Amino acid sequence: IVLPKLFLGPDRFYHDPERELYGMDLYTGGTIIPYPMQQLPGSAYWLPDEEYRTMILRIGANLSRAGFRVLVAHGHGPSTHQFAALEEEMKERYGLICFTAFDVLENTPLRYQNDHAAANETSITMAVRPELVQMERFAAGEEPVAMAGEDPRIHASADYGRKILEINIDA
């Protein structure tokens, strides 16, 4: 069974009296081009760590009660890492074996979703849902904001995406 996507998760944050910024709203390195702190379009997913942890444990309890033995979760980096940190507790409390796609392969360019809006994620989308990739939306001469990883304009392709998927499925 595949549960609906969770649109809330943990991430780094910055609060001051005038604004709240989360995740890639904050430049902290690792992106192709540095950029100022700003609220990015679509940045609406943040949940405090403890609330996220409580939610994941409740999901684990419900799935265990329904007879599930294995729970696989993967998504946005911080939520994936926090889910992984709960693997032992989920096993002890609910008898659930938990893992993420990061558990399957070591850190490699072919690891599933190992960047942020860059060549890896773009290539996966090109392979699975090519109609969603709109490379023409990159403004001519402007560098992308909030991208971490290899530049998809140069390195992304449907073939690369299929290779990522095949390697991870086989692993």
Q: Could you tell me what each predicted segment is?
A:
Residues 1-171:
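Extended, histidine- and acidic-residue-enriched regions that form the cofactor-binding/catalytic faces
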